[in-house]
């Protein structure tokens, strides 16, 4: 399940791609399959181990070109261990909302992005997220949870303050918003479990009907907002 549109970001074979806050690697995998030189970064040793295992499986299955590469690095997004201007593309998907000092993480993203390079930054969208916060304290108050809700304009301002220029916006995962509202309101009921099964089925099978429905609903109900930015050359 990808939040970032790779065609819109312009990820191509041979590019260096940094996936910040990679989790278990979902965005790193797609860049790897496209032939990029991928570096996936996270603080979780467990998630990085999973990322390495899946990248190895992708290579073994022949799903990545032989000249592509993938590495997983444990690092703090506020102090990245890379030189300035290192990466053609940077992805930060659903991570900034977890970081109290997001300004430092954004500054590091901008620092390691090459001049003329592009980045995609995704966060939970304001309205669906506000509903979740209103329905459940546990949703955001647990350790490592969400510490803020962004408006798209606010996130754009923060990225531009770091020297980046917003070049596009998108929304994703409209079918996931009602699931999280149900889960926040009712926790693990039969309805919530059934909805979760529907989402898993949709992710695996990607039927035309649900793909069309989500694409149509994304502008209104998209769970995530995606900002595409560019570092001036």
Indicate where each model-derived feature is located.
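Conserved N-terminal segment of class I S-adenosyl-L-methionine
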Residues: 1-83, 89-93, 103-106, 147, ...
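A short hydrophobic/small-residue beta-strand
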Residues: 38, 119-120
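A short His-aromatic
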Residues: 94-98
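A short glycine-rich, Lys/Arg-flanked "PGG" loop and its adjoining helix->strand segment in the class I
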Residues: 103-118
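Alpha/beta-hydrolase-fold catalytic nucleophile elbow
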Residues: 122-124, 172
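Short, glycine-/aromatic-enriched active-site segment of Class I SAM-dependent methyltransferases
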Residues: 124-148, 157
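Short alpha-helix
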Residues: 147-162, 169
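Conserved catalytic loop of SAM-dependent methyltransferase domains
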Residues: 168-205, 223-224
